[in-house]
Amino acid sequence: MVAWNNAAARPSCGHMNLSWPWRFLRLVAAAGWLAAHGGSLAAQDVSKDKPLELPTYTVTDSRELPPPEPWFYGRIPGFEVLSNASEKSTKRLVGDFQRFFLALSLVWPGVQQKTAVPTSLIICGRGGKFDTFIPTGQQRPNRAMASLTLRAAEQSAIVIDFQTKVLNLSTSEGATAAVSTAAAAEDGVSLGGGDPGFQVDAYRQLYREYIRFLLGGVEPRGPAWFEEGVAQIFMAMEVTNTTIIVGKVENPNTISAEQGALNDAGISGTAPAEDRDFNAALAKRRLLGMDELFAVTHDAPEANNALGGTWAKQAYAFVHWGLYGDQGKHQKAFITFLRRLDREPATEALFKECFKQSYQDMLFTIRGYVEFTNYKIAGVQAGKGEKLPTPPPFELREATEGEVGRIKGDALRLAGDVAAARTAMTTPYIRGERDPQLLAAIGLLERAANDDGRARKFLEAAAQAKAARPRAYLELAKMRFAEATAKPAETQARFSAEQTVAVLTPLFTARTQTPPLAEVYELIAEAWARSIITPGTDHLGVLDEGVRFFPRTTALVYATAVQKVRVGLVADARSLIDLGLRVATEAETRRKFERLQASLPAAK
């Protein structure tokens, strides 16, 4: 592990431990899986013996089904890749991303988590496809956006605009108004009258979006300015065969290759601007007030349209100053500030307490840091004669209609366009596609649309085909639970053994897949609470597993405590009640735990 101390971009040797000690970035290591004990419930899931008849979708208007779209498909660790760029361009972009992914794992170990539900990486290379994934409310004629993350629960997608090479921006920084027109060809350049625009580097935008994706999945989530600042730092990370450098900023006096070529040729005019580091981007701009910087939320236009924006570059400058500025001497105050923001709002009083500066003082500090950036660089250096690890080859093939429909449909659903999502998913289904993952996706779409009849059939079929999608098993279990609740087979509204098995079977499948879902464990507890069968201690071990994964989910903690009382494990119940009282934030929740505590026999 090596570092460089920079003054006016002249490196000298030094050492530091590259670590990210912020509490809300520390990913909790999950406990090992407990074995699933069947016990008296080791019965066959009776639903597997029932023949399934899948629903029929009928085209009722005069329009024909849209023709199949040519896309490529591939997989890398943690991602399904869907691209309509050329095969060569896709392999180049994904191969570069794999190197970035591997480099990030070396300098920031533990931040990348494995999941059975891979994130979709959608590369839009032609046909203006990127715009179809922009959520309603974020669409604007002068978008400064070339990438976006779509997320809901465990489902997520990163979408990259690989078609647009230049965005013509109408910004407060002085660009003249011009309508952005994307080129029809993949490698085209979009230019508009009067505004030279900003170059779009899809590679760097993918780096940025991936960091924002990682940080957006951490709880409690950090502030938007911090996510953007860290993303900008890693967007500029340099990776070679032997070295990874984090935190280095460019020489602000350099010009782009395109501008240099124009100058050398004696051609007047301005080339499209590059998306530069903060020391160049902010050199001639008015800074935002610190209160303005901190007020921007994750879904604000400034955060979603960061390309060329002052907010993004000032966030970059402030985070870089806090982590690397003046040889890293501000790190302690900066990290203290971040930790305090977990539990209190950003105020000038808090800021002064941490940094011993007012907001206005910090603007002068940032201005000075932009003009003369004295900082420490961090990184990794391979040993003498060695090279850093290289990623495995990336295989690409033509995507099936089912893969295209499922991946696009899921992303469109995440973007809020349910109608387009249904069209994308059902079109390949009507043509005969029966891929288990597609069936699961359609089932979840219909479930969200409250069409439980269709949803049940698709989810049953997906479960029989062993689809890898824990949410599908959870929703199937919820429908079976509702069915058993409506018609309990035992007295006192209790579930029979068969009904209990029917509910628990998909839940136990879901818990073998990642990511773990708190709702899975909550429904397991509820099923036991309704069952005629008293669970054994081995069965309740599954609930202990859930509490280890989700110690702050008070509904799960409470339900587990109730079941512990039911089987006589009073000491375990007391520990769970103590946990619930520590983490509960609502008065009524605390009262529930207190009532349960009062019902316990006196401790001996």
Where are these regions (language model features)?
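Alpha-helical adaptor scaffolds
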Residues: L444, K478-T485, Q492-A497, F508-E545
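Acidic/His/Gly-enriched intrinsically disordered linker/tail segments
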Residues: P67, N142-V159, D187, D201, ...
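Canonical positions in the second alpha-helix
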Residues: P428, A461-A462, L507-A510, E545-G546, ...
